[in-house]
């Protein structure tokens, strides 16, 4: 009897399966075999779509970034977009700890400076920076300084949450970000006078 060839999977389907594996079992369990199994097949069809496992991982990273971007977009809609984004960054770490670890806690191949890290990590960097410049009437340079301080602080909270070392309520997070933001803003504006 004639067996039609198994339907091939799209890059999107393979990436989604990869995200599932990472979410449930962790990055270390992401193998071609595990992907095939998750898709109900062998590993073979994966390599008709991708050249190798590195390409698969790049696509999964892209899919994880898309999930993260949804959080950022939500933050950008808030009245204080800058604070909104910081809060959403932490929410992403709380709700998607393994995707957060994949995107923001993996060792980098080269060590860029912080001002390079932020745009690389965040496609939304320009939008966030503009919201700071406009809301607080700051120069680009001062906005970047403010953003850098806040991002480092926010990243610290997010890492504590993503690794289950600490838990904070939404109110605590909002208050912590506000205090550091106001203090840093005062310092940066005060430096002018």
Predicted regions and their residues:
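Amphipathic alpha-helical linker/stalk segments
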Residues: 58-84, 118, 123-134
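Hydrophobic alpha-helical connector segments
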Residues: 72-99, 147-150
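Short secondary-structure transition hinges
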Residues: 91, 98-130, 159, 163, ...
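Helix-turn-helix
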Residues: 13, 17, 21-55, 59
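N-terminal intrinsically disordered/low-complexity leader segments
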Residues: 1-9, 192-193
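N-terminal positioning helix adjacent to the helix-turn-helix/winged-helix DNA-binding module
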Residues: 10, 14-17, 64, 146
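Amphipathic alpha-helical packing segments from all-alpha helical-bundle domains
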Residues: 110-137, 144-148, 175-189
């Amino acid at each position: 009897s004639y067996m039609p060839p198994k339907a091939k999977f799209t890059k999107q389907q393979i990436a989604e399966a990869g995200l599932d594996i990472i979410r449930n079992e962790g990055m270390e369990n992401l193998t071609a075999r595990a992907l095939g199994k998750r898709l109900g097949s062998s590993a073979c069809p994966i390599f008709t779509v991708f050249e190798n496992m590195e390409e698969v991982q790049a696509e999964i990273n892209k899919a994880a970034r898309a999930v993260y971007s949804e959080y950022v977009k939500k933050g950008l809609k808030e009245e204080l977009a800058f604070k909104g984004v910081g809060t959403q960054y932490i929410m992403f770490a709380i709700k998607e700890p393994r995707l957060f670890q994949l995107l923001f806690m993996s060792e980098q191949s080269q060590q860029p400076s912080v001002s390079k890290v932020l745009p690389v990590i965040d496609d939304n960097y320009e939008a966030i920076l503009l919201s700071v410049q406009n809301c607080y009437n700051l120069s680009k340079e001062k906005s970047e300084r403010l953003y850098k301080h806040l991002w480092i602080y926010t990243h610290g909270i997010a890492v504590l949450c993503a690794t289950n070392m600490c838990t904070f309520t939404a109110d605590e997070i909002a208050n912590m970000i506000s205090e550091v933001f106001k203090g840093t803003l005062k310092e940066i504006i005060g430096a002018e006078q």
